[in-house]
Structures are given as structure tokens and as C-alpha cells.
Amino acid sequence: MENKYIVLDTETTGLNAAEDELLQVSIIDNEGAVLFDSYIKPTQHTEWAEAERINHISPEMVADSPTIEEVISEINDILKRYDKIVGYNVRFDADFLKHNGAEFLNTAEYADAMKMFAPIYGEWNDQRGSYKWQKLTTAAGYYGYDWSAHEEAHNSLGDCYATLFVYDKINTDTMVIERVIDGKRVGIELTPAEISQ
């Protein structure tokens, strides 16, 4: 088992893993090396206008791409080497992959940068009684991510790089929280991830 983690992202024809299909799958390691990146040709859908407006992946772009069945063993070879999976709304991507035959380790830990970022950004959602989940573009902008360095937003490889950047910032940037202990003001240095726990 490697003592590292992977960042994964997908682009899909819609939001329902049982009905919609993968259009792109990207996986990078914690150092930014590309482990897998491919467009995926759907086998049931021939158009996805609503999703295309968001991810800009047209039917023509995936027409000559492999199907998920043709690449799932390559994806599984990667997944079985990592016990930590990072993503932005990671369960969405993991569910789509699992529905298509992906085999994550039973012991895999999932780190969701979206859920970690929500209390840092601090926008409260009264209806849910919790912090509002923010878009990846919001989280990346908050930390000053330069999209031009890699792909654009809503391309799964570009989203992997942005997620890696945000996840790293959440876990390495520190803030000084001041507390009064025994009558003395003391500064405690914590990462945002430590503060949100």
C-alpha cells in the first residue's frame, strides 16, 4: 500500500449514477502526477445538453473514446494501491465509478474537500442547519488558485488539480486563534481543517 493519496474527479451526462453515464475520468496522485485521464464514450446516452452546458463535453468529443468497460480494469489497478481518496464532493464521483465497476478498497478513507471547505468559507444554510457547500470554483478562488496553470473548471483533470490545491491549502495554511489561558492571551496556530473539527 502506498502512503499517499489520490485525487479523482469525473464528468457525467447527469447527476444520477443509476441512469447517467461517465464522460470523463481523471485521477492524479498527491504530487499532481496524472495516473489516469480519459474521455469516456457513453453506451446509452447520445446527447446530454444540460450537462454539456456545464462541462462543455460534446458527443463529438467522446465519439472515439473508450467505453468505461474498456478502461475500468486500468482504473481498478490504480484504486487498489491507495487507501485515501480525495475529491470535491467525492461521494458523487465514487458512486458513479462504483456503479460502473470500480473497486475501491474496503478500508478506503474518503476526504471531501467540499465538506472541509464549507465551515472555512462560513456561509450558513438555515434550511439544512449546516454550512453551505460551495462550488469548487469558489473554494479555488478563495485560496487564489490559477486555473490557467492546468485545465479549465468542469474538465475532470482541471478539477483534480484545483481540488489538490484546495485540499493542500485546507491542511497546510494556518491561522492564529487567540485564547485567554490562566489570564494570559495565547495564540494557538491551527490549520482550517483542525479548526473545523
Language model: regions and residue ranges:
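Short intrinsically disordered terminal tails
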Residues: M1, S196-Q197
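P-loop/Walker A phosphate-binding loop and immediately adjacent motor/lid segment at beta-alpha junctions
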Residues: L105-E109, R179-I181
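Conserved non-catalytic scaffold segment of RNase H-like nuclease domains
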Residues: M1-T107, S130-G144, S148
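Short alpha-helix plus adjacent loop in nuclease-associated cores
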Residues: A111-Y131
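Acidic, Mg2+-coordinating catalytic module of metal-dependent nucleases/exonucleases
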Residues: K84-F96, G129, W133-S196
